[in-house]
Amino acid sequence: MIGRLNLITKSNLFKNVNNLNNKNYYSTCLVIAEHDNNQLLNSTLNTITAASKLGVTNISVLVAGSKCGPVADSVSKVSGVTNVVCVDHPTLEHSLAETITPIIVKLQSSSSKEGDEITHIFTPASNFGKNFLPRVAALLNVSQISEITKVKDAETFQRPIYAGNAIATVKSTDKCKVGTVRTTAFDKAPTSGGSAKVVSANDWAVPLIEKAISETNIKWESSEVKKSERPELTSARVVVSGGRGMKNGENFKMLEELADTLGGAVGASRAAVDSGFVSNDLQVGQTGKIVAPELYIAVGISGAIQHLAGMKDSKVIVAINKDPEAPIFQVADVGLVGDLFNEVPKLTESIKKSK
């Protein structure tokens, strides 16, 4: 009798192990890809790396856009990606929250029925991700975790608070963890070595899109794109930023020349943007763009905590300011106290001569 009980126990044990393998261990992180319908943006590669820290079984990537097939193909080659879901529809060209959200919610809600449950949904903490992810979290009735900078385990994450002056460790017990990833905190996933299968979801996604369009009457009106030969601000190796000390927008040409000499991008503090010196797409900081270049040159920037929150992870920080007590010098690796209108042209000329 005892032997039989042992045999039954072993049998049940194997069944339980199989059930665990089939249910608990088949967990998926769904990464929502940021792209321009032609190319995958680096922010998605950083987000995939964050997803790889979770210990989930699968990393699936949703590519939603218009004529975005080439993007889906490139994602399938990214190391660590196991599945690619592609939804191609003209309305998705601009990733409107009203049209992309139902697709994500449907993917998550139907995943548990298929035994491969989506336990995490990650997307870059950019304007792209911030636009729709709060809707996703609300519809799934879960709390969103914003600006994830470290994945400790599948339930525990770190994120900056108080303009980056403190790091909060948060634990989520939600069935599905929904979060935006601060891309500067993670390396880019290798763009080769993967062989994921690309699956079209148009058959069930298109009706959802058309329903969303009819119910919200949403449509894209227009966009204004500024062409620049300089690298994109968030991915530039070198960033030269100016603050209120630049005095006017015309003086930013001085920084543009320095940035071009170094092959970098031009940024600005909120004070410079609010003063009308430059457009807000150049703003670096808590309410602007988060950057972490190899070299960050802050010119005429005092160093408000909101600005520091957007650039303090830069590898090398150089500050040029005439005020020796400026807070920016507290985080700078190299500081130059002097008149920027004298020092910046000298620096630019010296770099040109050294080339």
Swiss-Prot record:
CDD domains the UniProt entry points to: ETF_alpha
Ligand binding (FAD): 295-323
Database matches in InterPro entries: DHS-like_NAD/FAD-binding_dom, ETF_a/b_N, ETF_a/FixB, ETF_alpha_N, ETF_asu_C, ETF_asu_C_CS, Rossmann-like_a/b/a_fold
Disulphide bonds in the chain: none
Compartments (UniProt record): Mitochondrion matrix
UniProtKB keywords: Electron transport, FAD, Flavoprotein, Mitochondrion, Transit peptide, Transport
Domain of life (superkingdom): Eukaryota
GO cellular component: mitochondrial matrix; mitochondrion
GO annotation, biological process: fatty acid beta-oxidation using acyl-CoA dehydrogenase
Presence of keyword Lyase: no
Assigned protein family: Belongs to the ETF alpha-subunit/FixB family.
Name listed for the protein in its UniProt record: Electron transfer flavoprotein subunit alpha, mitochondrial
Lineage per the UniProt record: Eukaryota, Amoebozoa, Evosea, Eumycetozoa, Dictyostelia
Underlying gene: etfa
